Amino acid sequence: MEVKIFTLLQIALFIALGIHLVVAGPETKEDKKSDVYELFTVEYCGTNCTLLTNGRWTACTGKKGTCRCYHESGEKVGLCLSTEYTDFSEYPNPKSSEIDAAAPLPRETH
């Protein structure tokens, strides 16, 4: 009986801690050097790459040539992934007048 109660308390503690961490989120300073202004995306290209007997890897096709083979050392099979890095600190913050000007206008009916 004690083991069941102890296990239940551990599970409740892990759930509470997990919820707290999700709600708290990462702490970042929103300045231009912060990670908040950087975005690194990785997409799976839908294929794998394999090590050939001549030591080269099979080509990764797809996504208009942006796919590359990523593999762990010593492995003979890797994943074809497309990566992209965007640094939003290079772009100015839009003003509300710019946002209003870019908003779609309602259709005029005659």
Curated annotation (Swiss-Prot):
Residues 1-24 form the signal peptide. Disulfide bonds join C45-C67, C49-C69, C60-C80. It comes from the Eukaryota. Glycans are attached at N48. One of its GO terms (cellular component) is extracellular region. Residues 89-110 are annotated as: Disordered. Transmembrane segments: none annotated. GO terms for molecular function: C-X-C chemokine binding. The keyword Glycoprotein applies. Keywords: Disulfide bond, Glycoprotein, Secreted, Signal. It is found in: Secreted. Salivary chemokine-binding protein which binds to host chemokines CXCL1, CXCL2 and CXCL8. This is Evasin P1166. The lineage of its organism: Eukaryota, Metazoa, Ecdysozoa, Arthropoda, Chelicerata.
